[in-house]
């Protein structure tokens, strides 16, 4: 059997394995906690950021999203738009960092009470479990259980197109009740 045929057979056999392996999450370089510990800056109307939304399983770009703070009052509203200018559903926070309407899932989720988007304390020893209920717009009588365990993993140096930053790495473990009663043990 010649070399090119062996290579083809081997690569054909391994191709399905490569398709099933998810992409890894980006990791920064571990660093010591900054002194003094930074504060989370408060929101300001007009503040905006743009990011690339990717599918973590295949690396495909799902879109380029811009979020802009449009309202600060009893709630904080982040207007969202796609690269072509189309308006997307707004994210709503009850206070800065406490999400009530989350747009990051395949369907819009409304949480009551709201959930933190980042650790409540910027400390490497911090972790906490949150229990709430969520509903899907159009089905608000159906409130389902949501448990989230958030834990800090440490400080790291990350490099992004905007520059090099020191960031706090944290992890969420989510256990939720699915709106489809046939789907159980939903853990993310």
Could you tell me what each predicted segment is?
Residues 23-36:
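Short, low-complexity, disordered segments immediately C-terminal to signal peptides
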Residues 34-160, 164-167, 174-185:
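Conserved functional acidic sites
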Residues 7-26:
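N-terminal export signals
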């Amino acid at each position: 059997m010649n070399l090119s045929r062996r290579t083809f057979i081997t690569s054909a056999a391994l191709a399905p394995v490569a398709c099933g392996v998810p992409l890894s999450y980006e990791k920064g370089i571990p660093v010591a906690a900054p002194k003094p510990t930074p504060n989370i800056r408060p929101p300001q109307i007009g503040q905006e950021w743009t990011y690339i939304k990717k599918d973590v399983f295949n690396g495909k770009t799902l879109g380029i999203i811009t979020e802009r703070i449009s309202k600060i009052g009893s709630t904080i509203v982040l207007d969202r738009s796609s690269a072509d200018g189309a308006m997307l559903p707004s994210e709503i926070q009850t206070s800065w960092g406490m999400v009530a309407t989350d747009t990051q899932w395949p369907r819009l989720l409304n949480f009551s009470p709201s959930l933190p988007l980042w650790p409540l304390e910027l400390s490497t020893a911090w972790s906490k479990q949150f229990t709430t209920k969520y509903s899907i717009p159009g089905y608000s009588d159906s409130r389902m259980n949501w448990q989230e365990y958030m834990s800090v993993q440490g400080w790291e140096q990350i490099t992004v197109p905007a520059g090099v930053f020191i960031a706090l790495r944290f992890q969420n473990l989510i256990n939720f009740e699915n709106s489809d009663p046939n789907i159980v043990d939903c853990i993310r």
